């Protein structure tokens, strides 16, 4: 019975990165051997055991065979006769198909160290094509390390998409990998890889449709709506924004793919036009509620948020109410963070100031100065409970109006200079 450290732990060790999770493979043992050593079985589908002291996962060396379409259509064989190389051969990429023995020696039968040094993601064997999740994983690793995909691997990924393997992916697995990819350092790269292999058209056709759609060059020097979306997503990542914010950044301009061709490159009403596509993506991916809600809110309101200096006080109050800013100020703040990424996610506009964010906060704070509890109590005491909402609105408007007047005056002065 020999144990080897495998997979991501070896890869990150060789890259000089912190090793977060350690996975082990056991060669020359079976389930009875593991139980006799005090290991606890935990795997339902695979022979996985927990170490009695460290509680790290130890898996019996195994081989796999494709039995049906999709990522669950596999049977496996785990026995004492399965070698380490056979176990490593079933893995996705060469950089993940290395092992380290107890003496620290690296076992690398498929050239993982070479590909690490070259910054290349390369599949281990044709068996890569048997698991469509590997398309997403490869795109995610590209986003993490900014590695390039080997030509033969991207070709195989295209073939998988053409053969319908990506269609067999279930929403939960797509979201799981997709969410991880969005939180990598370079999520733009993930989307680029998915587009290059054709998977984006299958998994996120609404995003794929943005590429080739022109925008006004004076607002968007990058021209292409798809490129702007990638830049906005990457800006959100560079800002260190959360998963819901990055997801919203990716979907914020879906309405531009719906713009009638006769009005291009203008996109009047794309904020409203994008709401239904965002809902469709949310449903297909089964996005968590907090991600889905923020994506829809940003899509619907980002243009209004940008144009705060042009709004009347009554419109501002209506926006604060419709976006639920009074009850959910934290979500309101995250939406405005995405608006910064949208503004700065343009060619040569990475450092464009966004004073609208601070102004919206100031407007919300000012509106909150109206004592709604006191107003409600006074209305009830006067037998005018039916006027509570109206009176609260009046009090809030009285707070908003002078602040908005000052902001617009300052904006006009800046534009004149």
Swiss-Prot record:
Against InterPro entries, the record matches this protein to: CCA_bact, HD/PDEase_dom, HD_domain, NT_sf, PolA_pol_head_dom, PolyA_RNA-bd, tRNA_CCA-adding_enzyme
Q: Which UniProt keywords apply?
A: ATP-binding, Hydrolase, Magnesium, Metal-binding, Multifunctional enzyme, Nickel, Nucleotide-binding, Nucleotidyltransferase, RNA repair, RNA-binding, Transferase, tRNA processing
Q: From the UniProt record, which GO molecular function terms apply?
A: ATP binding; CCA tRNA nucleotidyltransferase activity; cyclic-nucleotide phosphodiesterase activity; magnesium ion binding; phosphatase activity; tRNA binding
Ranges in coiled-coil conformation: none
User: Can you state which reaction this protein catalyses?
Assistant: a tRNA precursor + 2 CTP + ATP = a tRNA with a 3' CCA end + 3 diphosphate; a tRNA with a 3' CCA end + 2 CTP + ATP = a tRNA with a 3' CCACCA end + 3 diphosphate
Which residues bind CTP per the record?
Answer: 8, 11, 91, 137, 140
Q: GO biological process: any one?
A: tRNA 3'-terminal CCA addition
Which residues does the annotation say bind ATP?
8, 11, 91, 137, 140
Which residue range or ranges hold the HD domain?
Answer: 225-326
What PROSITE patterns has UniProt attached to this entry? HD (PS51831)
- Textual note on the cofactor: Magnesium is required for nucleotidyltransferase activity. Nickel for phosphatase activity.
The residues listed in the UniProt record as binding Mg(2+), with positions renumbered to this chain, are: 21, 23
User: What EC number(s) are associated with this protein in UniProt?
Assistant: 2.7.7.72, 3.1.3.-, 3.1.4.-
Q: What does this protein do?
A: Catalyzes the addition and repair of the essential 3'-terminal CCA sequence in tRNAs without using a nucleic acid template. Adds these three nucleotides in the order of C, C, and A to the tRNA nucleotide-73, using CTP and ATP as substrates and producing inorganic pyrophosphate. tRNA 3'-terminal CCA addition is required both for tRNA processing and repair. Also involved in tRNA surveillance by mediating tandem CCA addition to generate a CCACCA at the 3' terminus of unstable tRNAs. While stable tRNAs receive only 3'-terminal CCA, unstable tRNAs are marked with CCACCA and rapidly degraded.
Assembly and oligomerization: Monomer. Can also form homodimers and oligomers.
Q: What else is known?
A: A single active site specifically recognizes both ATP and CTP and is responsible for their addition.
Family under the similarity heading = Belongs to the tRNA nucleotidyltransferase/poly(A) polymerase family. Bacterial CCA-adding enzyme type 1 subfamily.
Q: What free text does the record give on domains?
A: Comprises two domains: an N-terminal domain containing the nucleotidyltransferase activity and a C-terminal HD domain associated with both phosphodiesterase and phosphatase activities.
* PANTHER family per UniProt: MULTIFUNCTIONAL CCA PROTEIN
Q: What is this protein called?
A: Multifunctional CCA protein
């Amino acid at each position: 019975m020999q144990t080897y450290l495998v997979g991501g732990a070896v890869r990150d060790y060789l890259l000089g990165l912190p090793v977060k999770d350690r996975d082990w493979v056991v060669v020359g043992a079976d389930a009875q051997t593991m139980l006799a050593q005090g290991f606890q079985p935990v795997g339902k589908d695979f022979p996985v055991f927990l170490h009695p002291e460290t509680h790290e996962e130890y898996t019996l060396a195994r081989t796999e065979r494709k039995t049906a379409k999709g990522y669950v259509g596999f049977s496996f064989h785990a026995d004492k006769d399965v070698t380490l190389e056979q176990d490593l051969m079933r893995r996705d990429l060469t950089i993940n198909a290395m092992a380290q023995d107890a003496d620290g020696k690296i076992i690398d039968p498929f050239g993982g160290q070479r590909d690490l040094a070259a910054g290349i993601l390369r599949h281990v064997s044709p068996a890569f094509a048997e698991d469509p999740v590997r398309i997403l994983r490869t795109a995610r690793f590209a986003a993490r390390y900014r590695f390039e995909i080997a030509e033969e691997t991207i070709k195989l990924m295209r073939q998988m998409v053409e053969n319908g393997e990506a269609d067999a992916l279930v929403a939960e697995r797509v979201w799981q990998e997709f969410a991880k990819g969005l939180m990598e350092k370079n999520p733009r790269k993930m989307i680029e890889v998915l587009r290059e292999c054709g998977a984006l058209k299958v998994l996120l056709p609404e995003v794929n449709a943005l590429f080739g759609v022109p925008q006004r060059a004076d607002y968007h020097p990058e021209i292409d709506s798809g490129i702007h979306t990638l830049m906005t997503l990457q800006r959100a990542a560079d800002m260190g924004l959360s998963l819901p914010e990055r997801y919203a950044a990716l979907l914020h301009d879906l309405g531009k793919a719906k713009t009638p061709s006769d009005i291009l490159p203008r996109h009047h009403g794309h904020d409203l036009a994008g709401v239904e596509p965002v809902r469709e993506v949310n449903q297909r991916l089964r996005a968590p509620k907090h991600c889905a809600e923020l994506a829809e809110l940003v899509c619907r309101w980002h243009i209004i948020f940008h144009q705060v200096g042009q709004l009347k006080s009554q419109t501002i109050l209506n926006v604060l109410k419709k976006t639920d800013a009074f009850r959910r100020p934290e979500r309101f703040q995250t939406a405005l963070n995405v608006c910064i990424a949208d503004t700065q996610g343009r060619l040569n506009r990475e450092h464009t100031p966004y004073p609208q964010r601070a102004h919206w906060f100031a407007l919300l704070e000012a509106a909150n100065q109206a004592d709604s509890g006191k107003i409600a109590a006074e209305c009830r005491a006067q037998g005018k409970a039916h006027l509570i909402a109206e009176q609260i609105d009046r009090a809030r408007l009285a707070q908003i109006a002078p602040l908005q007047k000052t902001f617009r005056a300052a904006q006009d002065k800046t534009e004149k200079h």
